[in-house]
Amino acid sequence: GVCCGVSFCYPC
């Protein structure tokens, strides 16, 4: 999967 976000990671 791909991570989105700056200060934390969440699935796109």
Curated annotation (Swiss-Prot):
It is found in: Secreted. Expressed by the venom duct. GO terms for cellular component: extracellular region. Disulfide bonds join 3-12, 4-9. Its main location: secreted. GO terms for molecular function: toxin activity. The modification 4-hydroxyproline is found at residue 11. Keywords: Disulfide bond, Hydroxylation, Neurotoxin, Secreted, Toxin. Belongs to the conotoxin T superfamily. Inhibits the neuronal noradrenaline transporter (NET/SLC6A2). The cysteine framework is X (CC-CX[hydroxyPro]C). This is Chi-conotoxin-like Ar1248. It comes from Conus araneosus.
